[in-house]
A protein has these predicted regions:
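Flavin (primarily FAD) cofactor-binding/catalytic cores of flavoenzymes
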Residues: 1-49, 69-211, 231-412, 419-526
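N-terminal glycine-rich dinucleotide-binding loop that anchors FAD/FMN and/or NAD(P) in oxidoreductases
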Residues: 44-69, 212-225
Length: 526
């Protein structure tokens, strides 16, 4: 069998590793357009800080980081600068992956011809065609940024080096917030505006409860609640957290550094946090969250101004954020950060679409075509999800895991549900997921869920339920009992007791729902 992996970033590398564990090396080749395995996030400027922690954003098969929290909030728990690229370099070296990668090769077209996948590849300006039995498409959504249509102001996606200018950053995602924070630094002497069409949901990197990364308060007990309950209760808790963050710090003290903001700046930060939340579309866990929360400090210190959308395609005049006043800005430059789009349709002549992939990773008609890294988490990280997808898809290809019958019908139904659930997100371009709910779905089909029976120890199972949620908790060949025993639980006991009581109170309702589903199913089948 001839297998091609397209892309050698985080998704491509972990897919290549699992393929080499399963198939002869002579069957596999990986194509990478660049000359590096560091991926799109591997070489960041020195002051860059990731939004997910090192602990949660690592491969289960290559564990480098624990869930220890540093004494001060200096971002040691997060990837800084080029650290994630260093991690990918080390991963590739450890598993001898580079010898299976052809660097400097770009995919220009793929199609199914005569029982195989025909790839049009380009290297040093020369094109060649190669045919494979199976394709793992691992380029994700970072291959082509969405464009900004402006007829009046020059635009760019290259922002480093911009100084002494009036700048408008277009976009409300984490990258846009990060760019705005960077350009608003005093040493750059810019006048900076962040243009938003709606509100955004901002989640703190460090939580006021115990001052730990927010990732470390997200455990399986919390995630076990029905999504509708989490949406309703979570919405109210987030408002409480914003309004009364100082109270939470007092209740659950920590030694972390406090923000160097005066009372007026703190109040302005809080005001904008609430305003952005109020204007955000969709329910709490149905829209993407922004964990680049540093930009709120820049807003509080009046180094960054949040405005509304442009009035027309000239991009010289804008609404204010409340869209009650017109602002004439005439910026020197627009910085594009309006998200990314997939090139699947362009590369396949419109034949391959995201909606045709079961679980966002297995093509429903061609079970030898796979997507890795296209699922984007509402809260979470792509590399860990990519590893789960890689394990699942390699298992599907090898016959280890069996796909359900009537796959096309199941996927059509799942796609309609996904589009309805995430109504504010363009699901033709992005496959939105809740990280652990999605990974659990794959884990169930792989038979590696960390159930009490599978773990075999009540004490260890409780630690898995209460410690920071991680894809390293699945009961597979990488399952490490000793490492789990050493993990810490950061959620305060009083909150754990409250969550446990809520689960107990909900038992009768869950049983009633199960009985109703059993009764309804036969009638639907008739």
């Amino acid at each position: 069998m001839k297998i091609a992996v397209v892309g050698a970033g985080s998704s491509g590398l972990v897919t290549l590793k699992y393929l080499l564990d399963t198939y002869p090396a002579t069957d596999i080749v990986c194509f990478e357009k660049s000359r590096s395995v560091r991926g799109c996030w591997g070489d960041q400027r020195p002051d860059f800080v990731s939004t997910s922690t090192k602990y949660t954003t690592q491969f289960s098969c290559f564990r480098q980081w624990s869930s220890e929290v540093a004494p001060k909030q200096n971002f040691e728990e997060f990837y800084r600068g080029a650290e994630f690229g260093d991690y990918l370099d080390a991963f590739a070296t450890t598993f001898n992956l580079r010898e299976h990668i052809r660097f400097g090769v770009e995919l220009r077209h793929l199609e199914w011809i005569g029982g195989g996948w025909s790839l049009l590849l380009a290297e040093n300006g020369e094109e060649e065609r190669m045919t494979f039995d199976s394709i793992f498409f691992c380029t994700g959504l970072v291959n082509q940024k969405a464009q900004v249509a402006s007829t009046g102001i020059p635009s760019t996606d290259k922002y480093e080096g911009i100084c002494n200018a009036t700048v408008v950053i277009v976009g409300g995602g984490e990258s846009a917030a990060d760019i705005a924070t960077y350009l608003a630094k005093p040493e750059h002497n810019n006048t900076v505006f962040l243009s938003l069409r709606s509100g955004i949901r901002v989640s703190p990197r460090y939580h006021p409860i115990r001052g730990v990364p927010s990732d470390f308060l997200r455990n399986r007990l919390l995630l076990s609640f029905d999504k509708r309950v989490r949406n309703r209760v979570g919405e109210r808790f987030v408002t409480f957290r914003i309004r009364f963050d100082r109270l939470l710090v007092w209740w659950f003290p920590h030694q972390g550094a406090t923000k160097n903001l005066n009372d007026r700046a703190q109040a302005l930060r809080r005001e904008w946090d609430l305003k952005l939340k109020a204007r955000a579309k969709g329910e709490l866990f149905n829209v993407f969250h922004n964990k680049s929360d540093d930009f709120l400090d820049a807003v509080a210190e009046k180094r960054l101004q949040i405005i509304g959308p442009p009035i027309d395609e000239q991009w010289t005049d804008y609404f204010d954020f409340d869209q009650t006043t017109t602002l004439h800005l005439s910026p020197d430059i627009l910085v594009r950060s309006t998200g990314y789009r997939s090139q699947l349709a362009e590369l396949s002549g419109g034949v391959i679409c995201l909606k045709d992939f079961y679980h966002g990773c297995v093509h429903t008609d061609r079970h030898n075509l796979f997507l890795i890294g296209f699922a984007r988490p509402i809260i979470g990280n792509i590399p860990s999800i990519g590893e789960m997808q890689a394990r699942y898809t390699v298992g599907v290809l090898s016959g280890k895991y069996t796909l359900p019958t009537a796959l096309k019908e199941k996927q059509d139904e799942a796609w309609n549900s996904l589009s309805a659930e995430y109504g504010t997100i363009n699901t033709e371009n992005v496959y939105p997921v809740e990280q652990f709910a999605y990974c659990d779905t794959l884990a169930r089909e792989m038979g590696i869920m960390p159930t009490l029976a599978a773990v075999g120890s009540l004490r260890l199972w409780l630690k898995i339920m209460l410690a920071p949620a991680s894809t390293m908790h699945y009961v597979d060949e990488c399952f490490d009992r000793q490492a789990i025993k050493r993990e810490k639980v950061y959620t305060p006991v009083i909150l754990l007791v409250f969550l446990a009581l809520m689960r107990l109170i909900g038992v009768p309702f869950r049983l009633l729902k199960s009985v109703r589903n059993v009764r309804i199913t036969p009638s639907r089948m008739r």
